[in-house]
Regions:
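Feature activates predominantly on carbohydrate-active enzymes
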Residues: 1-201, 205-218, 265
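Active-site neighborhood of glycoside hydrolase catalytic domains
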Residues: 165-175, 180-292
Length: 292
């Protein structure tokens, strides 16, 4: 017989994966024959994870993965005892999550009209490309992952990497556009205008729907690769900088501190709703927030 002592249900899941690894590879097939006569050596295995966070990052903005493809990835993660999927749901190249308060995010922002071929900056295909997930589909995926012992952490990348959102709602940018969902890789100069209260209203409304879908403790807010070129010339952003008393110093420019203000404000909002933020390392620009 096989005995599995474990402190948690996930411990049992991981133990079962270990046992399966002792068996022939056919154990991972879609069907098993009743004639199989497998055995495992008599042994004791003491196993425990080295790291509490064992994750994978999945970017569905540049390349859209179908629901079945995402589930297959989750299945493979479970085999390898990974417990966290960092799901990158938005970027310049596409917005992939339904937000009911802002339907144009998927009506407009989920489709790009062209895509750069490889790294040839002047060479594009001419095929519209995109897709998105409904909120019901995402809730189903959260449950599917949880049944495998996997937590999904959603990422809404901001205030940069927001061309798909700006194409949908141009008033959220510093210049008013026109903008388009990006068909290029790399970094765009146009970002959310954080001098406007309307922008923070947008961010908070989006995050309210995100936390209603995803029960994870952490929400990833990006924070990376946010050029400050537009903020430097934007009257609304400069007015907020003046109002907050932000100034250039030996550690950074006032616009860097404006991003820090933005991060702190979003962090406070999510903390009030029982969540914590994660971001890319460039979120450090302008100083680290309290609980990030």
């Amino acid at each position: 017989k096989i005995e599995i002592p474990a402190a948690t249900p996930n411990g049992v899941r991981y133990a079962l994966q270990t046992i399966k690894q002792l068996l022939p590879v056919a154990i991972y097939g879609e069907t098993l024959s009743a004639d199989e006569n497998w055995s495992v050596p008599c042994t004791t295995i003491n196993d425990a994870p080295r790291f509490g966070y064992r994750g994978m990052h999945l970017d569905v903005a540049r390349h859209f993965f179908t629901l079945d493809e995402v589930k297959r990835i989750l299945n493979v993660m479970a085999v390898h005892k990974l417990n966290t999927l960092h799901w990158h749901l938005t970027d310049d190249q596409g917005w992939r999550v339904e937000i009911k308060k802002y339907p144009r995010l998927t009506e407009v922002g989920s489709i790009r009209n062209k895509t750069m071929i490889r790294k040839e900056w002047d060479n594009y295909d001419t095929t519209p490309y995109g897709g998105f997930y409904t909120q019901d589909e995402l809730r189903d995926m959260v449950k599917y992952a949880a049944d495998l012992g996997i937590t999904i952490i959603p990422e809404i990348d901001l205030p940069g990497h927001m061309m798909a959102a700006l194409a949908s709602y141009p008033e959220l940018g510093c210049t008013g556009g026109p903008y388009e969902v990006s068909g290029q890789w790399g970094i765009r100069d146009d970002v959310l205008c954080v001098g406007k209260e309307k922008t923070f209203e947008f961010i908070e409304n989006v995050l309210l729907e995100i936390i209603d879908i995803f029960p994870s403790k952490y929400i990833h807010i990006g924070g990376d690769e946010c050029p400050k070129i537009r903020w430097e010339k934007c009257p609304a952003c400069q007015a907020r900088i003046q109002k907050l008393g932000l100034k250039d110093d030996e550690h950074g420019k006032a616009e860097h501190y404006l991003q820090s203000y933005t991060t702190e404000r979003i962090e406070k909002f999510l903390n009030e709703h029982g969540r914590e933020i994660i971001g890319w390392d460039e979120m450090l620009e302008g100083g680290l927030t309290t609980n990030a």
